[in-house]
């Protein structure tokens, strides 16, 4: 039997996720993002990014907390090869304090928050990000697992 894969499943996928470094404040929330790569010229109308956090509580049958992070509008015509970088921060903050990477060509930058006060840091180790189509089908999923920060070597005082 042939493997059947509907076209919806090949339109886009999660490319990468970049959680904010520890110690980042809300003002720096734009440094945290997730990238979605478009693989087919198509319409991503009502596709959404979902954030899930496992709560690991025995008393809860399905110990998961979730929220919608970003929704593509309707219609949302996209081209193959486009990369959407969805920042956790604010569009207003980006306009007034652009990060050097925001000015680089080749990515479409979108923001979860409009006003600066609505920005938040959301991605922590062990969270999941899902790309969900308009019908609620999970198209792609990624686990947030940033590299651990390496401790800085301590300098030993010179002996005389």
Predicted regions and their residues:
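Eukaryotic short linear interaction motifs
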Residues: 43-44, 56-58, 93-94, 138-139
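Short aromatic-acidic-glycine turn motif
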Residues: 53-66
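A structural motif detector for short, solvent-exposed N-terminal "entry" segments of globular domains
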Residues: 1-55, 117-125, 143-160
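Solvent-exposed beta-edge/loop recognition patches
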Residues: 65-160
């Amino acid at each position: 039997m042939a493997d059947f894969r509907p076209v919806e499943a090949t339109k886009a996928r999660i490319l990468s996720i970049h959680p904010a470094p520890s110690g980042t404040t809300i003002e720096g929330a734009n440094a945290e993002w997730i990238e979605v790569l478009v693989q087919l010229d198509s319409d991503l109308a009502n596709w959404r990014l979902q954030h899930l956090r496992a709560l690991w509580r025995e008393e809860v049958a399905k110990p998961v907390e979730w929220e919608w992070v970003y929704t593509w509008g309707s219609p949302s015509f996209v081209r193959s090869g486009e990369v959407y970088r969805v920042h956790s921060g604010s569009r207003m903050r980006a306009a007034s304090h652009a990060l050097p990477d925001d000015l680089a060509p080749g990515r479409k930058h979108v923001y979860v928050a409009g006003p600066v006060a609505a920005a938040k840091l959301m991605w922590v180790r062990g969270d999941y990000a899902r790309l969900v189509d308009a019908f609620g089908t999970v198209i792609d999923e990624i686990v947030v697992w940033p590299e651990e920060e390496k401790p800085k070597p301590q300098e030993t005082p010179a002996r005389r």
